């Protein structure tokens, strides 16, 4: 006989229990979440405001960056990262060997330490008309993690002291005057710095997992994560989620971020609450990692772009505040999934992550496969934004996989959840 126990965990620090410190929560619409349309986003982008810096959003935020005045780079912005990161291959292609390079090990979302280099020289770069000089950069194999189209990442050093608007729907970033006030409809969320370095922010988020378990937690703001809400394995142990959840899907990544392999357990949360807004039936995950960032106990998990994409976002990096306003895509939940995480390569898409028991898995797709076409389309015909939309569409996939020197065609339906 199953005994039901109502366990409500309140883990939020008293200083950030609510959003009342700098704003007032706005009532949200009671409309049911809507599903994404096939092979499309919900709405089309509008013209950019004056001074805006264009970005491409496809799980990550992609920017055109100019390094040392002459070297154009395609970079991802990541609040979970402090300084600039440069891909090893890009570094060798564009910069002379440096006597200031030193070997190092770094820790990220993966289960292990990652070998890298630390360059102690000054690095100048610009995003739009905004210039920054950082003392030092980390050089590592980012393309293994993010794909051949990524040259590097920039992070919190660029944002230090700035107030910045991020618009996921219209695709831009706008550096605001420090005294600028967000428009009507925004709600301020008082955040806290994770430590005295004031380089990583944690914000309060509530999650009702089901009728038995709820959590008011402190989540690291990680705009380098494409996920919505990820619970650390330390929280999973405290909540005893393994005993509570039944409909859980295991997803394993060969390269799940800096630090190598990663295992996530995917499930649907009844409700996620942030800044007074409720997102229903959201796909979230908890980590199975025993080491690395996702096993930390100084915060409860990650808030990624999969949650933030429902809002217009203004971050005051000087005051450690985040202002949120539901955008035109608010509540539009993704109902279909390919079951795979694909890393773009020059000659195809590498199957880096795969959900066990998914339709793709049961049809014969394996981690490490290289897909050379999807429904007759090659990588040259599908950019990152289109690939994201295709992955969440209802449309069946027919993929060609290059395996053991020969091509194999596999067709499967998307998983619906």
Describe the function of each predicted region.
Residues 22-417:
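Pepsin/retropepsin-fold aspartyl endopeptidases
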């Amino acid at each position: 006989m199953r005994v039901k126990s109502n366990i409500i965990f309140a883990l939020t620090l008293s200083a950030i229990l609510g959003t009342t410190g700098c704003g007032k929560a706005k009532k949200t619409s009671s409309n049911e979440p809507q599903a994404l349309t096939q092979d499309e986003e919900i709405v089309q982008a509008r013209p950019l405001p004056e001074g805006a810096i264009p970005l491409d959003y496809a799980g990550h935020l992609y920017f055109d960056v100019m390094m040392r005045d002459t070297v154009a780079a395609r970079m991802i912005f990541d609040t979970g990262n402090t300084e600039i990161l440069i891909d090893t291959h890009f570094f060798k292609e564009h910069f002379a060997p440096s006597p200031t390079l030193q070997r190092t090990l770094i820790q990220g979302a993966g289960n292990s330490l990652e070998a890298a280099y630390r360059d102690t020289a000054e690095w100048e770069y610009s995003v739009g008309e905004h210039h920054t000089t950082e003392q030092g950069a980390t050089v590592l194999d980012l393309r293994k993690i993010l794909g051949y189209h990524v040259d590097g990442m920039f992070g919190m050093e660029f944002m230090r002291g700035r107030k910045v608007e991020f618009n996921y729907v219209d695709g831009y970033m706008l550096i605001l005057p420090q005294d600028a006030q967000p428009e009507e409809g925004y709600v301020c969320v008082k955040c806290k710095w994770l430590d005295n370095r004031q380089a990583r922010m944690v914000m309060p988020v509530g999650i009702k997992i089901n009728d038995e378990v709820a959590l008011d937690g402190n989540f690291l703001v990680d705009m380098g994560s494409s996920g919505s809400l990820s619970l650390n394995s330390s929280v999973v142990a405290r909540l005893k989620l393994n005993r509570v959840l039944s409909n859980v899907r295991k997803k394993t990544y060969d390269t799940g971020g800096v630090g190598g392999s990663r295992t996530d357990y995917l499930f649907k949360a009844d409700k996620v609450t942030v800044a007074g807004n409720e997102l229903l039936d959201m796909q979230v995950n908890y980590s199975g990692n025993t080491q690395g960032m996702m096993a930390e106990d100084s915060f409860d998990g990650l808030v990624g772009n999969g949650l933030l994409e429902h809002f217009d976002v203004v971050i005051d990096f000087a005051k450690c505040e985040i202002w949120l306003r539901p955008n035109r895509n608010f509540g539009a939940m993704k109902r279909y999934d390919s079951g795979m995480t694909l890393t773009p390569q020059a000659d195809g898409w590498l199957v880096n992550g795969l959900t066990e028991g998914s339709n793709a898995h049961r049809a014969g797709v394996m981690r490490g496969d290289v897909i050379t076409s999807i429904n007759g389309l090659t990588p040259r015909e599908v950019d990152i934004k289109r690939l994201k939309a295709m992955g969440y569409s209802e449309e069946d996939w027919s993929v060609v996989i290059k395996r053991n020197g020969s091509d194999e065609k596999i067709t499967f339906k998307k998983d619906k959840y």
